Every structure is written in structure tokens, then in C-alpha cells.
């Protein structure tokens, strides 16, 4: 099954320590500014998949992360579909305010920080820390930053810094933009809850050091050598080139991380549950008839065992963009 990349876990760690902008605010205009520069100007993003059987129609807009910082997203196709839609499905944002952040840092310090008076270099394998330190200096100019955080959290911060330097952002929320458009069209919105703070804490609490190191390795490979692929993928999304996105395969280290997470950990359970929750939500809307628009991460949609394959297996017709 094609699952969300290890960035899901890294980003979750970022959410927990408050380095993530709340995605619930949305935008006030139909043309939604997604941030600041790899591709500039107004872009439509990819077309939508059309899943249907009988009188039931499901339009799926594939989201992606990271995306170019400097594009303005606007899709006339989305606006047209909203004119005939009964319901919009979007991921429920995980909101953490400053009070929650402080509470987490006080009560869950052992989950997020190294602890015991140690530093990152004391708990991370020497070869990984050497690579981490090299990239940290390259992207931040700071030789001591994040030394008190556990490896997966520190690497998450570094990954976001690298994204920023190359003109990408993982903070851009297509769901929030579609949520705003749905309100303007008077369309009902259903938020699909995929994870809560407790789920993410459990995933971090139960993650074994060997699994953590495997996923840190995957993230470091992303930072060291995979940024060009991510830039290419982000540009393909902005220009609507779905075939290009499908052909840009992830490094083997990412697959190794996913395999480690799947080996009975709470993180693996969380990833599987996210997939199952989305499939159940999409099928429920199809069974209810009418027209639904959903915003779903492309990593969950595409490839063997993705949500589109699941829907085909259940007898639904799936038309590509």
C-alpha cells in the first residue's frame, strides 16, 4: 500500500512543538495565496479524479506537500464542481495554540527532548549526527541548533529549514482553501479527523530507537540528495502534470522507514488508520449518492494499493484528470 511518506511523522513532531502554522484559518478570497517561489503566478494545480457509480459522483482534488512557496492557487474546475456539490470532505486540521505548546513542552518533555542532560550528539549514531550537523550548518549557519531535541524532531526542523531554502513549504494547506470556497458556495463541509495530538504523542512514545534512526536516515537522504525531486514534483503539481508526479519515485530509504513503521508500532498503526479512515469516508459519501468533492493527499491516492485502487476494487469507475 502506498502510504504517506515519513514526512507525516516528522511533520507531526513539528506540530507538537509548535513550529507549524495553524491551517484552520483559510483565506478570504477565491484566489488563495499559498505563500512565497519555485513556480510563480496563478496556477490551477492538477485536475480532479472523477469516481462514480450510478447517481453517485466523487471529485477528488489531490493535495501535495511540500509545494512551491510562491504560487497562487485557483481552480475553475473546483469552483464549477462546487456549484453542483452536496458536500466537501477535507482533512480536519490539527490546531495547537500557544498554551497547548507550553503544556506539551512541560508535560511531554521526555517525548520531544533528549533528556537526562544529554544532547542530540549523545543519542544519535555518530555517522547520522555528522551528516545532520553538516546539513544543519549548510541550511541554518548554526552549529548547535536543535541539540536538545530527540533525533526525529530535530531532523524535522532541519527538513523544514531545507524546504524553505529551496523555495518549498510544507505549511501550505489546500484543504483550508477549498474549505473557504465551500463556505462561499454554501456547501456543507465534513472534516475527516485523521489524527489527534494524543495519537501523535503515542506514535513518538512507542517509536523504537532503531525505527527512529531508520526514519532519520530517510529524512537526511531527502535533505542531502532528494530536494531536486521534491522541487520537480512540486512544479509538476503546480502545472497539473500528474503523470510526472507518479513517475518521481521516492528513495529506497523512505521505503525502509515505512517498513520499519509498519512493524507493529503505534506510528504504523496511525498511518494505516489514516488510510482506512479516508477510504471509509469516501465510500460513505459515494453510497449516499449525490456529488461530493474531497481533498486528499496524493501520496494516499496514487500507486498500487492507494485509495484510487481501493475504490476501483469496490466496483467504482475512476476517471483520471
Question: What does each model-identified segment do?
Answer:
Residues 260-321:
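A cross-kingdom marker for long, charged
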